[in-house]
UniProtKB/Swiss-Prot annotation:
GO cellular component entries: membrane; vacuolar membrane
Topology in the lipid bilayer: Multi-pass membrane protein
Function comment: Root-specific cadmium (Cd) transporter that mediates Cd efflux in root vacuoles. Involved in Cd detoxification by sequestrating Cd into root vacuoles and limiting translocation of Cd from the roots to the shoots, and accumulation in grains.
Region of interest (Disordered), residue spans: 931-952
Name used for this protein in its record: Cadmium/zinc-transporting ATPase HMA3
Matches recorded under Pfam families: E1-E2_ATPase, HMA, Hydrolase
InterPro entries: ATPase_P-typ_cyto_dom_N, ATPase_P-typ_P_site, ATPase_P-typ_TM_dom_sf, ATPase_P-typ_transduc_dom_A_sf, Cation_Transport_ATPase_IB, HAD-like_sf, HAD_sf, HMA_dom
Domain HMA: 42-108
Listed transmembrane segments: 120-140, 144-164, 171-191, 193-213, 340-360, 371-391, 683-703, 707-727
Source organism of this protein record: Oryza sativa subsp. japonica
Length: 1004
């Protein structure tokens, strides 16, 4: 299909202005105007449905090149998207759309943040052509109906004709031109039905292919439209454009709003959903000094955020630029296919012309058969399916990776991921958490320096460093009531792989590992220091050439690191640790990992890591390097695939890496490798299928069985199959390789829970005595797996007043079971949405035994008579974010106690003015602590309150309200009846958190 003017690849970037003009920095990312530095520039996204293969890339470029003000054009065939960077005054959007639509490319401007998904219904041209063609099949009943086949051609051909003539006028041979030639040939041969079938099949297949492509690109479009366009200045309440927010401005983010900027929380507390960036499916608690990123969702609290980056430099903006660069890159396989396709089309067209003309010139018999054979070959000259086989699969795989929080910088990287045979891990911040703590700190020498002075100097210098150890030293000094002052530090220097240096108050201070001793010309022996101080990592402080202090630090391995390395081993991949830390620290980390690392290399400089990565490539083959710091940048660039860890990692690591994990979950590494291998298999199937179908059609035609409509169906149908096969990479049920129990442990919020879950995973499946009745899910007490049968859930029978058992539907209750009973951990637990259920109950997330429960809540259910959000933890557990769902039609909504004898936070009943009884039960019982507990507003006011608990002064369990009278029933006891119907109803609808009652006071 592609002619001599075909672009070198499916994606192309065309610079249309001279270098001096093109050097102007873009002022906009993802839609909208930008200003400053010259004329305004705008980036516009267009859905161009007429772009189906590489020939249209050159066509789009030639159409937009003559327009004044157009600077850069990017065409992404896989998603049928054209990105134009232009001056809106000289080249408005309407002019760009008009230029493309003149060629019949069906262009439209994509609204900011929209998905670009086309209508699910076929166009009138397709419908009319199909109806007329179907009617023509009855010509055996009434021969004149054969004319309806010609009418089907006339009805369905206009889009093909517009695009075909536009391409032909620019000397471009695309699929529309080839199909029009085939239709004309069939009409000349008198095969009217076949001509109509060609038009109908081609237009229908193109519509289905467009629908599939736009559906595949919808996720990427939404990813690029996450950033809100407005922000609220906290100090004034003024609503401004995010592009007008400057570094240092404080913006207000209310519950349910998108965070508009990257920054640091300065006021308020909340939970933020970061799945759009990191792929993590649970919210992250935020409090003052926590980092937040633009495009994430603030769940349930107010926070004030001090801006740390401009909108164009935010993480979302960087992601957008990364995505565009990835879409415009081509893999080795794609470049090879494009090169072959460039010669395939002209060669087949020449052969088809020879098949048609030579027999005619020689006066051979059966010319009609020769001409049909030529037409079949002409239709087969379009290599659309072959050309699409690689970019569409790569596009879908990169989109799937982005949903998992893995950003891959192009098709070459994706292919290399599937070939990895060895992985080198940095230790600090990659295998370990990078959250150091100072175990001990000692003065050495003749103690001329006082401890307070030395800590002040160290903290002031380390305040200028971003290394994880620096934060530990600053925190240690602050724990001694010493505040750093980095403004007093002069001549600050960083020595990668060694440490840092700074001058303060006339003192020359070196802080680092034992190499720092040699740099500072300190005569002390590290062996002597090692005998004096014991620790995992040892650091030294040299003041004016003399060793002044020695300290030890500890750092724990990340949860899931050992399992990730075992996963890599199951894939036949070698795992190696490369660290600049001491051999003792490396050995300690290996012990925490259970000895899963096959090689350890310690006390390395950045150049040593590069040398070792090159050695791994020579020994094992394609090698991946995973790191997060400045020291890893060179090794990341040297590896076949360099992977940087986390959005908070160093900028140098993210810039030089080939892929970025937006979270710090090491389990994403084997997921990325599995995805790369799956993408390679998909591409291989696409290429093999495309070639096989072409070969079969040509072989059938050569066997003197040329069927024109079958050739068309094979051509466009193969394109559709290639797209659909590639979209299998987007399936949500596709597993990247992390085991479910390991993923659950990786998301545990406390070290105690991670240790408990890790121990549980190694224990026998039989439940112990303290966990009778608990549900076993591979050692991790997570929510039931999708598709689990109803008998695996406990149904609690809670009926409204007057309801009879026989009136209830077959499935009377939907229950979200506790996520983490008996000391387990529960994440993302909630009742399923079920409009016909009579009762929906969200059970406690984190049952007895100190379990942890997060995001527990009943689902919204308009037809439910009662919705109860049960306690999010019991028996010393911890409940976070527990609340009853908002439900205007419910008879009673009860927010039960958050933390029975443990700690309950942010527990509140939903606001519900029309509710007959709304009760916010006590937050914290049995001496526990309850915070943020309040009853919803209701009229008439409730009577009675209770406080205190059997735990004495251990905490305050404050029962906010009761109904009419403070009568409650025992937690876990049977129902209690009372003379008051309302009180009895209260006790039946939910278990209370008090055991006794005395004069309006309920003892917890």
């Amino acid at each position: 299909m592609a002619g001599k003017d075909e672009a070198e690849g499916l994606e192309a970037r065309l610079l249309l202005l001279p270098p001096e003009a093109a050097a102007e920095e873009p002022t906009r990312c993802g839609g909208g105007d930008g200003g400053g530095g010259g004329r305004k520039r705008k980036k516009t996204y267009l859905d161009v449905l007429g772009v189906c293969c590489s020939a249209e890339v050159a066509l789009v470029e030639r159409l937009l090149a003559p327009l004044d003000g157009v600077r850069v054009v990017s065409v992404v065939v896989a998603s049928r998207t054209v990105v134009v960077e232009h001056d809106p005054a000289a080249a408005p959007e309407s002019a760009i759309v008009k230029a493309l639509n003149k060629a019949g490319l069906e262009a439209s401007v994509r609204a900011y943040g929209s998905s670009g998904v086309v209508s699910r219904w076929p166009s009138p041209y397709i419908v009319a052509s199909g109806v007329l063609l179907t009617a023509s099949f009855f010509e055996w009943l009434f021969p004149p109906l054969q004319c309806l086949a010609v009418a089907a051609v006339v009805a369905g051909a206009p889009p093909m004709v517009r695009r075909g003539f536009a391409a032909a006028s620019r000397l471009s041979l695309d699929i529309n031109v080839l199909m029009l030639i085939a239709v004309a040939g069939a009409l000349c041969l008198g095969d009217y039905t076949e001509a109509g079938a060609i038009v109908f099949l081609f237009t229908t297949a193109e519509w289905l292919e467009t629908l599939a492509c736009t559906k595949a690109s919808a996720g990427m479009s939404s990813l690029m439209g996450m950033l809100p366009v407005k922000a609220v200045i906290a100090t004034t309440g003024e609503v401004v454009s995010v592009r007008d927010v400057r570094v240092g401005d404080v913006v207000a983010v209310r519950a349910g709003e998108i965070v508009p900027v990257d920054g640091v929380v300065v006021d308020g507390q909340s939970e933020v959903d970061e799945r759009s960036l990191t792929g993590e499916s649970f919210p992250v608690p935020k409090q003052p000094h926590s980092e937040v990123w633009a495009g994430t969702m603030n769940f349930d609290g107010y926070i004030a955020v001090r801006t740390t980056a401009l909108a164009e430099n935010s993480t979302v903006a960087k992601m957008e630029r990364l995505v565009e660069a990835a879409q415009n890159s081509r893999s080795k396989t794609q470049r090879l296919i494009d090169s072959c396709a460039k010669y395939y089309t002209p060669a087949v067209v020449v052969v088809a012309a020879g098949v048609a003309l030579i027999p005619a010139l020689l006066g051979a018999d059966g010319l009609e058969q020769w001409w049909k054979l030529a037409l079949v070959m002409l239709v087969s000259a379009c290599p659309c399916a072959l050309v699409l086989s690689t970019p569409v699969a790569s596009f879908c795989a990169m989109l799937r990776a982005a949903r998992m929080g893995i950003f891959i910088k192009g098709g070459d990287v994706l292919e290399s991921l599937g070939e990895i045979r060895a992985v080198a891990f940095d230790k600090t911040g990659t295998i370990t958490r990078g959250e150091f703590s100072i175990d001990s700190f000692h003065l050495v020498g003749d103690h001329k320096v006082e401890m307070d002075h030395l800590l002040y100097w160290i903290a002031s210098i380390e305040s200028k460093s971003s290394h994880p150890m620096a934060a530990a030293l600053v925190e240690y000094a602050q724990s001694k009531s010493i505040q750093p002052n980095p403004e007093n530090v002069g001549d600050f220097r960083i020595y990668p792989g060694e440490g840092i240096y700074g001058e303060i108050h006339g003192k020359h201070i070196y802080i680092g590992n034992r190499r720092t001793l040699a740099r500072a010309s300190s005569p002390q022996s590290t062996q002597e220091m090692g005998e004096m101080i014991k620790g995992v990592s040892i650091g030294y402080v040299i003041c004016d050439g003399e060793l002044a202090g020695v300290f030890s630090l500890s750092d724990d391995c990340r949860t899931g690191a050992a399992e990730a390395i075992r996963e890599l081993g199951s894939l036949g991949i070698k795992s190696v640790m490369l660290t600049g830390d001491s051999s003792a620290a490396a050995t300690h980390a290996q012990g925490q990992l259970g000895g899963v690392m096959e090689e350890l290399h310690s006390e390395l400089l950045p150049e040593d890591k590069v040398r070792l990565v090159s050695g791994l490539k020579a020994r094992f083959g394609p090698t991946m390097m995973v790191g997060d710091g400045m020291n890893d940048a060179a090794a990341l660039a040297a590896a076949d695939v360099g992977v940087s860890m986390g959005i908070s990692g160093s900028a140098a690591a993210m810039e030089t890496s080939h892929a970025t994990l937006m979270s710090s979950d090491v389990l994403r590494v084997p997921e990325a490798v599995r995805l790369g291998r799956c993408a390679r298999r998909t591409i291989a199937v696409n290429v093999a299928g495309s070639v096989a179908v072409k070969a079969a059609v040509l072989a059938l035609a050569a066997a003197w069985r040329p069927v024109l409509w079958a050739a068309v169906l094979a051509d466009v149908g193969t394109c559709l199959l290639v797209v659909l096969n590639s979209m299998t990479l987007l399936r949500e049920e596709w597993k990247g390789g992390a085991k479910e129990d390991g993923a659950c442990r990786a998301t545990a919020r406390s070290l105690v829970m991670r240790s408990q879950l890790a121990a549980d995973s190694q224990a026998p499946n039989a439940a112990d005595a303290g966990a009778a009745g608990r549900e076993q899910t591979n050692g991790c007490r997570c929510c039931p797996k999708p598709g689990m049968s109803p008998e695996h859930s406990v149904v609690i029978d809670i009926r409204a007043d007057g309801e009879r058992q026989e009136e209830r539907p077959a499935e009377a209750a939907v229950v979200a079971k506790c996520c983490g009973g008996g000391g387990g951990e529960g994440i993302r637990c909630g009742a399923s949405k079920k409009p016909t259920a009579t009762v929906v109950v969200a059970k406690c997330c984190g049952g007895g035994g100190g379990g942890e429960g997060t995001r527990c809540g009943a689902s919204k259910n308009p037809a439910t008579a009662a919705v109860v959000a049960k306690c999010c933890s019991g028996g010393g557990g911890e409940g976070i974010g527990c609340g009853a769902s908002k439900k205007p039609t419910a008879t009673a909504v009860v927010a039960k106690c958050c933390g029975g004898g443990g700690e309950g936070t942010r527990c509140a009943a939903s606001k519900k003015p029309a509710t007959a009884a709304v009760v916010a039960k006590c937050c914290g019982g049995d001496g526990g602590e309850g915070t943020g507990c309040g009853a919803s507003k209701r009229s008439p006011p409730a009577e009675g309150s209770c406080s205190g608990g059997e735990g004495g002064t251990n905490g305050v369990g404050r029962c906010c309200t009761s109904v009419k009278r403070p009568t409650c029933c025992d937690m876990g006891a049977a129902e209690v009846s009372d003379s008051s119907p309302e009180t009895a109803k209260d006790c039946r609808n939910g278990r209370c958190c008090a055991k006794t009652m005395n004069s309006g006071e309920v003892k917890g």
